[in-house]
Amino acid sequence: MNYLHTQRYNISFIIFVLMLIPTACDEDREHPVPYVHVRFDFNIIHYNLAGPGSSHQFSVDESGGYRGIIVHRLSMDEFRAFDRACPCDPHNCKVSIDPDNQLLATDPCCESVFLLIDGTIVEGDAQFPLREYQATFNPATNRLRITN
């Protein structure tokens, strides 16, 4: 009798765990912007990245990424780099720096707005932030390396 009780408990526990798996997977959805290898190195003097708060966007031909890259300078030594592909429709739409506010990037397709400090969604239909790349700055040479 005790053996039967243990078996029922084990089966109930297994069913409970299996019911939790789809919920847990839903939390970790894959980012819609495809992963592409990025290795881009440039001298910031040649672009509009002279001071904190400045931003520059590169085409995919210049920099790589899936749809190009936007670089934002946070401070004298800290930069952020994001793919220009919009998470709403990465195959057809790309974000651009807002000409009135270089802290923002906008997508004309879904009208989403993203903060270039960290790539988060400010407004719009986007469900994911911008895909971020690693930005490493060498102040001795004024070179910025963007990788993933």
What spans do the regions from the language model cover?
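Bacterial N-terminal signal peptides that target proteins for export
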Residues: N2-F13
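N-terminal pre-ligand scaffold of iron-sulfur
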Residues: D26-D100, L115-L116, R131-N148
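Short cysteine-rich clusters marking metal-coordination/redox-active sites
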Residues: C86, T106-D107
